[in-house]
Amino acid sequence: MKKQIFNEENVSIEKKIEPKQEFDATKVSVEDETEQLTAELIIEKGFTPSRFWIRGLLAVLVLFGLAVIARSVQCLIDSVQAHQWIDLAFAIVFFMVSLAGIGAIIREWYWLVYLRKHQDTQHISKQLLMDELLVTSGQDNVVICHQILADLKSLPHIAVAKQRWQSQLNEAYNAKEVLYLFSENVLKPLDTQVKQIIAKSATENAIIVAVSPLVIVDMLMIAWRNIALVNKISRLYGMRLGYLSRLKLFKMVLTNMVFAGATEMATDVGMDFFSQNLTAKVSLRAAQGIGVGLLTARLGIKAMEFCRPIAFQKEERPKISEIRQQLLIAVKNRFFAKNEA
């Protein structure tokens, strides 16, 4: 056996070369958006009461209503038997007020159930639109779309949009395709109209705050206009809301607004001011007006997302940047042009 001698210089060391890794910024933004939506759902779920408390509250209200009616009837009987006609008049008034109050409670509960069904329909549509491998039939979704059309029948041009959507339907379409056609033919014109209303309201609020010197009057007027904006958006999407259901809608919208925060909006506005060379002469009132206008726009967009019967797809989701440029131009033309003159 021959002796083998190894020289370190002859030994070749293989280096493992890894391929270059590239990161796409668009993918990062999508992940951030997904995380934000997930967190919004978590916060919204945290603010939603459990079914146990809801059923308990319903049972208490039912018992209270029965007790009030029984007491009213007892007062009527006692007044008639005792020939106390003044007490009888008060008993009749109390009985009528009790019936009106119970009827109002039942009506408000009905609108809360309606809002819950609206949320369930939106959640189902969101799951169907996000599922890329969905191959189920679209007949069930056709029924859902007809239910939505029943709520929208009072709006103009809905009949034409309904005929256009039905003419494009095919039995071979799956659930996702049916929802896409319904969104394109029926809801997209409504989306355009709602965006115009949001942009107009945000611009007017910004100008009001930028020009008006009365802070308290501004706050009251902006609050009233924002409430009117949400009510107008809900009516355009065919939502019928009661007092409690409207409060619940406001709660959901404001909860998501608070979570999202205003830091990203402030950054975007700062970039626009730098690009348009407005930082040298921007005033405090103009900045406050722009901030109020952007908050109004965000409130309208969030209300739009909650009131729309079918959830937005990723490319359809409205963005505040669509309104921001129009808002800045309006404030510049109305406020800075006035100062220069």
Curated annotation (Swiss-Prot):
Pfam families: DUF697. InterPro entries: DUF697, UPF0283. It is a multi-pass membrane protein. One of its GO terms (cellular component) is plasma membrane. It is found in: Cell inner membrane. Keywords: Cell inner membrane, Cell membrane, Membrane, Transmembrane, Transmembrane helix. The keyword Membrane applies. It comes from the Bacteria. The chain crosses the membrane at residues 57-77, 86-106, 204-224. This is UPF0283 membrane protein HD_1769. It comes from Haemophilus ducreyi (strain 35000HP / ATCC 700724).
